[in-house]
């Protein structure tokens, strides 16, 4: 009789433990699935959202999108698969982010979020290499994307209106690093390695509709891979890196300035195969090309640690100010340039007013300081 009672008690305990474990799993699952709402509820901040911070960690996809009030305090949290190396472009006030395989995240200027596939899943499964977007460009409601492979690049096109399915436009035998669109042509830059130190660039022109190569031109300059901008008149501006140290100088003990390249901002003429220096106040323009809007070019001079505004019509500098940090991103809205500036442990927003040629506001945001943050305003 005692053995039967022991057996019953043992079964009862096992069933109870299984039920408890099951309840814990269900609760944890619910908390995970609704973690956005739980985090937002715990914030207890009901202010209106004025900014969005895209936050990512260096080594995994545990990303977040934080909605911030006017003082930079978080009012809402959305967890997303965002890697540190994500790509983004801004178009008509909306942000488009390549945040995972075969996926683009659209962050609307009103703060709305929308995921969409590059191509249909059934087509996507046929290509087991996956699609990881390197560069994006939007023209007439169509997004063009590059996916670099070893020694070649696939180019995809996606109709943003949803009237047509996404498709692979072409595959070309070049390692594409950047692109922009001029009228009916896709302008691409590709690296050409002569050796480990000497890198030069090819310019490839494709037909935007067919993907066929129309022209390839080779340049002695190395066109920096990440920054390529065009103005309203379809002039193309790039960064060019020119060697400043010889092979013999590289073998010598380190000097105070041992950078291999000097960085210049240049104008690219794709039709006569020339790269022209931009001369401002008698000096060749150096530094990082941030963006071009209307007649103004926005640049960061890393030698002087200064943000600069260049009037391209007058070829003169109209603004210059020291920036204590790294300019992570820029966003243009209502004649104002919003600059997201990061330091080792802080994140700032500088707002430059085009009409007055002044930085009219500087904000500090205390949000996920151990992450990489990209912040921009919402309407």
Question: What are these model-predicted stretches?
Answer:
Residues 36-44, 80-93, 123-140, 171-183, ...:
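Repeated scaffold domains used in trafficking and secretory/extracellular systems
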């Amino acid at each position: 009789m005692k053995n039967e009672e022991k057996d019953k008690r043992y079964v009862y305990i096992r069933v109870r433990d299984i039920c408890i474990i099951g309840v814990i799993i269900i609760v944890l699952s619910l908390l995970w699935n609704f973690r956005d709402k739980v985090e937002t509820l715990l914030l207890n901040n009901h202010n209106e959202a004025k900014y969005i911070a895209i936050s990512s960690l260096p080594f995994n996809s545990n990303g977040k999108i934080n909605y911030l009030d006017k003082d930079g305090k978080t009012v809402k949290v959305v967890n997303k698969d965002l890697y540190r190396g994500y790509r983004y472009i801004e178009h008509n006030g909306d942000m488009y982010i390549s945040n995972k395989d075969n996926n683009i995240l659209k962050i609307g200027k009103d703060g709305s979020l929308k995921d969409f596939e590059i191509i249909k899943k059934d087509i996507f499964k046929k290509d087991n290499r996956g699609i990881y977007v390197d560069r994006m460009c939007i023209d007439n409601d169509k997004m063009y994307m590059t996916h670099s492979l070893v020694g070649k690049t696939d180019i995809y096109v996606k109709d943003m209106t949803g009237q047509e399915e996404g498709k692979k436009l072409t595959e070309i035998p070049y390692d594409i690093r950047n692109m922009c669109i001029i009228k009916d042509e896709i302008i691409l830059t590709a690296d050409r390695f002569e050796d480990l130190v000497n890198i030069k660039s090819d310019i490839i022109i494709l037909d935007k509709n067919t993907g066929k190569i129309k022209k390839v031109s080779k340049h002695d300059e190395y066109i920096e891979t990440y920054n390529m901008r065009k103005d309203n008149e379809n002039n193309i501006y790039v960064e060019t890196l020119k060697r400043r140290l010889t092979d013999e100088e590289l073998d010598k003990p380190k000097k105070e300035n041992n950078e291999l390249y000097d960085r210049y901002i240049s104008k690219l003429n794709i039709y006569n195969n020339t790269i022209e220096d931009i001369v401002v106040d008698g000096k060749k323009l150096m530094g990082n090309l941030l963006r071009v809007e209307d007649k103004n070019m926005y640049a960061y001079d890393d030698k002087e640690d200064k943000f600069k505004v260049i009037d391209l019509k007058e070829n003169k500098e109209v603004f210059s100010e020291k920036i204590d940090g790294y300019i992570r991103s820029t966003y243009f809205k209502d004649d104002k340039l919003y600059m997201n500036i990061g330091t080792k442990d802080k994140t700032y927003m500088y707002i430059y007013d085009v009409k007055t040629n002044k930085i009219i506001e500087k904000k500090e945001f205390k949000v996920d300081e151990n992450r990489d943050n990209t912040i921009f305003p919402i309407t």
